[in-house]
Each structure stands twice: as structure tokens, then as C-alpha cells.
From Swiss-Prot:
The gene is accD1. It comes from Roseiflexus castenholzii (strain DSM 13941 / HLO8). Transmembrane segments: none annotated. HAMAP family: AcetylCoA_CT_beta. Belongs to the AccD/PCCB family. The keyword Transferase applies. This is Acetyl-coenzyme A carboxylase carboxyl transferase subunit beta 1.
Length: 298
């Protein structure tokens, strides 16, 4: 088993976003090592620096994991509602929604749909961190619950790719109840024997981590991803202690048994394909076992 994921990685190309603006600068500076990287080379390397630092991908770029032309989007018109007419000293929620929709071209922070990896069908949900921090509100939760139901009905695996600050505070209790709602939907997916594979990318916090991602059958994280419930600064201010430098990193969580693996972005499609192959014929294998003669008891 230890050699299961050591095959030559099959890379994926980040999907091109329509009408994407030409970058103003020809170079990108890595925030980790400070090196200047030629923009085209940086894009070809899936926005990963040679030092290993993984920069953020847009939600639609993550769809490059799927087979070309296989993605079909669901519920794109489903949009958040400002039920509380939320206003704070810093912003008006309705204005913030409009700005995020204009900036990202999305109605909300989650894209859902169906697709395939190496010909194996699945349902997928991808967060967009640039849309109010990838936060989960009412429309987000409804989209996610619907795609989980779709996966259960079609009896295919669910893949979620998650970068989020947690539940959307501007929607109050409506946002919090989505945590229970999507987890309830996941029980139906489990009942039909289909897996939920969660990929955690930097950052993944709050209600998103505390609900559907933590109960996934397989939890994968990118190297160096920050993952936790409360943020590092909040914890340090609360306990009045300095936390270790590697606290809440993907590697820290792996060493404490909280996630299953840490996978570099360039190897992710290959690892997902391997996992999907393991699950692909699971119902048939289960039926074979059920129909096999009972073992003689000692």
C-alpha cells in the first residue's frame, strides 16, 4: 500500500477562465521565498513556486482537474439573499454581494456540477475564496446539499475543493444551519455507498471545516495549507500563548491524524484518479462478498 501513490503523476492544466484579463505584470513575486517568476511559467506550473509554495487558484481554474469538456454546471443562478438587511460599521452586505459578484463573475462562493476524471463520473463542488472569503451562506448550503443529493441519486462520488473562512456572518443563523443541512445530506450519500473526497486548500477555517469537510471519507490537503476552526491570531489572543510556527498547517494536521494525506497540486489529479478507481467498482465487489459462501467457523 505504501507505493500506491508513487506512480508518475498525471498533471492537470488549470482551466482557462473566459474573458480573463491579461496580467499587468510579466512577473509574479512568491510571497514565501521572494523569487520573481515569469507569469506564463508560473501559470504553467499551476501557480506553484519552485520553493513549493502553492498560490491560490480561482474556482474555475480548479475545474482543470476534470476531463476536458466533461464539466456541466448546476444551479448557477442560485444567489444569496440579504434576509437580515445586514449593515455593519464597515460594510453593507448587499453592496458586498454585488461587488463580489462583479469581481468574480459568480453568483455565490460555490460552483457545483458533474464531470469526470479519467472517464470516471463524479459530482464536484468548488469554493471561490475571492467571493467573501469563500464563506458558506444560505445559497452556498443549498447548492452543496443539492449536489450531494445529485451524487447520491446518480450513485457517483462527490469531490469538494475547499478554501473558506467559514460560515457567512452577514447571514447569521441561516448560515450556521447550513452546517447541519449539508451533513444530513451526506448521510444519504454514505447510505448508497459513495465516497466524499475533500481537498483542503489554503485557507480552510470555521464552519466549512467544522461541518462537511471534516466528515469526508478521504481528506487531502495541499502542502502548507492553513487549516483550523479559529484563526491563529484569535487563539493566541485567547490563550495568551505563542503557538508553534507550524501550528494549523496541513503537515501538522497530518502528523496528528486529522487528515489522510498531503498532496502537491501537480500530483492531485493522479491521486484522485487512483482513489476513484478504488471506489469505482465498490458496489459490485460488495455484492460479490455478500453472495460468497460463508466462511467455516472454527
Amino acid at each position: 500500500m505504501k507505493d500506491l501513490f508513487r506512480r508518475a503523476p498525471k498533471r492537470f492544466t488549470a482551466a482557462r477562465i473566459e474573458n480573463q484579463a491579461i496580467p499587468d505584470n510579466m512577473w509574479v513575486k512568491c510571497p514565501s521565498c521572494g523569487d520573481l517568476i515569469y507569469t506564463r511559467q508560473f501559470s504553467d506550473n499551476l501557480k506553484v513556486c519552485k520553493c513549493g509554495y502553492h498560490m491560490r487558484l480561482a474556482a474555475r481554474e480548479w475545474l482543470g482537474l476534470l476531463d476536458d469538456g466533461s464539466f456541466v454546471e448546476f444551479d448557477a443562478a442560485l444567489a444569496p439573499v440579504d434576509a437580515l438587511e445586514f449593515i455593519s460599521p464597515r460594510h453593507v452586505y448587499a453592496h458586498k454581494l454585488s461587488e463580489s459578484q462583479e469581481q468574480t463573475g459568480l453568483n455565490d462562493a460555490l460552483i457545483t456540477g458533474s464531470g469526470a476524471i479519467e472517464g470516471m463520473p463524479l459530482c464536484v463542488a468548488v469554493t471561490e475564496f475571492e467571493f467573501i472569503g469563500g464563506s458558506m451562506g444560505g445559497a452556498f448550503g443549498e447548492r452543496l446539499a443539492r449536489i450531494i443529493e445529485q451524487a447520491a441519486d446518480a450513485r457517483v462520488p462527490l469531490l469538494t475543493i475547499n478554501a473558506s473562512g467559514g460560515a457567512r456572518q452577514e447571514e447569521g443563523t441561516l448560515a450556521l444551519l447550513q452546517m447541519a443541512k449539508v451533513n444530513m445530506a451526506l448521510t444519504r450519500l454514505a447510505a448508497v455507498g459513495q465516497p466524499h473526497i475533500a481537498v483542503l486548500v489554503d485557507p480552510c477555517y470555521g464552519g466549512v471545516l467544522a461541518s462537511y469537510t471534516s466528515v469526508a471519507d478521504i481528506i487531502i490537503a495541499e502542502p502548507g495549507a492553513r487549516i483550523g476552526f479559529a484563526g491563529r491570531r484569535v487563539i493566541e489572543q485567547t490563550i495568551r500563548q505563542k503557538l508553534p510556527a507550524h501550528f494549523q498547517t496541513a503537515e501538522f494536521l497530518l502528523s496528528h491524524g486529522m487528515i489522510d494525506m498531503v498532496t502537491p497540486r501537480g500530483e492531485l489529479r493522479s491521486v484522485l484518479a487512483t482513489l476513484l478507481r478504488l471506489f469505482h467498482n465498490a458496489p459490485e465487489r460488495a455484492a460479490d462478498v455478500q453472495n460468497a459462501p460463508a466462511l467455516a467457523r472454527a
